[in-house]
């Protein structure tokens, strides 16, 4: 009887080990790849992204692409009207070292791709319906051979952000399944979080939850919340670059220190989508919580 029980135990352990070996593991997710938005005024959008921000436009799959570097870019949907009048965000995207393995890993967690793997990328929906695209590192991305723009006001996307209603549900996906890590959290009041930043598991870029938005946010409010951030070394130098690109309006020179201690400057595209210039490192102690991760730099672009 003891031999039978011992044999059964060994068989059970072997089966458990085999199942564990067969379970897909999550490959590295290294940073932000792109942010995609709708525009209802392509000509004005070109003046903003092309002239004011200084990025040179390319086209692929019916969209406008503005390379920030050879692995990060901004996408604009110009031919399809936004599905909602109060929102312009279409997708956020992150780079992975193995898109196929990540797709299998997410399927093993019950998350089916809405856009199956094709041309080095696939897309899923997070718990609140945001389209999240994962891009294969080293794939033939349209920006991979793009030369640096001489008028570019930044060469790094450091984070993307969007409105979140249920933080616990989002955490289960972004932190629990994808492995994103806490970076910083805070808000206008020290004891209430309006912004929660979580870094990619294998890099320094981050996703920012924008909390406490109320039941019916307007397009203007959504434009502030659903945003992307361009990293810069020096905000005064950025202001000079914007002036050189003929940036018009008070916002072109209006920098401030955020609650996280980093200098920032906000501009808005013709559809009221916010572009946040932000210095890579804080210049003073942050409010509300300490940073718990490494800050991005100009030289660690997501490749």
Regions found by a protein language model. Give the residues of each.
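Short, solvent-exposed beta-strand edge segments and adjacent coil->beta transition regions
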Residues: 30-34, 71, 87-91, 155-159, ...
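Core segments of cupin and vicinal oxygen chelate
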Residues: 27, 33-74, 108, 120-123, ...
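Short hydrophobic/aromatic beta-strand micro-patches
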Residues: 38, 93-95, 163, 229-231
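Vicinal oxygen chelate
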Residues: 21-27, 103-156, 161-162, 183-200, ...
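Mid-chain, structured segments of secreted extracytoplasmic proteins
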Residues: 68-109
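Bacterial N-terminal signal peptides
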Residues: 5-17
